[in-house]
Amino acid sequence: MKDTILEVKDLSVTFTQYDRGFSRRTLHAVEKMDLSVRAGEIVAVVGSSGSGKSLLAHAIMGILPYNSAMDGEIRFLGTPLTAERVKKLRGHEIVFVPQSVSYLDPLMKIGDQIRNGKKDHSVKEKCLAVLKRYGLAPDIREKY
């Protein structure tokens, strides 16, 4: 059996919505979701607009909006994904890939988008490592 990379257990995401005065209500956006991703697997999260796909990603990345609350457990490589841990891993071990290609700039070279415009040598090496990890040739950096 392959090692589990990401495990989501009993995940719920709610939002507090404030109305006029002091009244408020709780909206249940994601309820009791389970997900497991093992080494070597490719997993697609599919659903209609508003079904919680992005909220799942935001919960994993630790970037839920201020008026939200999360319940449940998220583990990465067997260890709970705490706020401190996800902050260290975000952008390195765990990366958010937006669901819309409109977030990518068609006028910017691929390498520049990966490097976020930074030019120092260590960032260039990290860019090459990312391309290699996904089986892409180094010269793709110069393409749009």
Residue ranges and their predicted role:
Residues 1-26:
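ABC-family P-loop ATPase nucleotide-binding domain
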Residues 46-48:
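The feature captures the beta-strand-to-loop junction immediately N-terminal to the Walker
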Residues 61-64:
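Helix-to-loop junction immediately C-terminal to a conserved catalytic motif
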Residues 69-80:
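Conserved ABC transporter NBD signature motif
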Residues 80-95:
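ABC ATPase NBD coupling module
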Residues 124-140:
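Conserved ABC ATPase "signature" region
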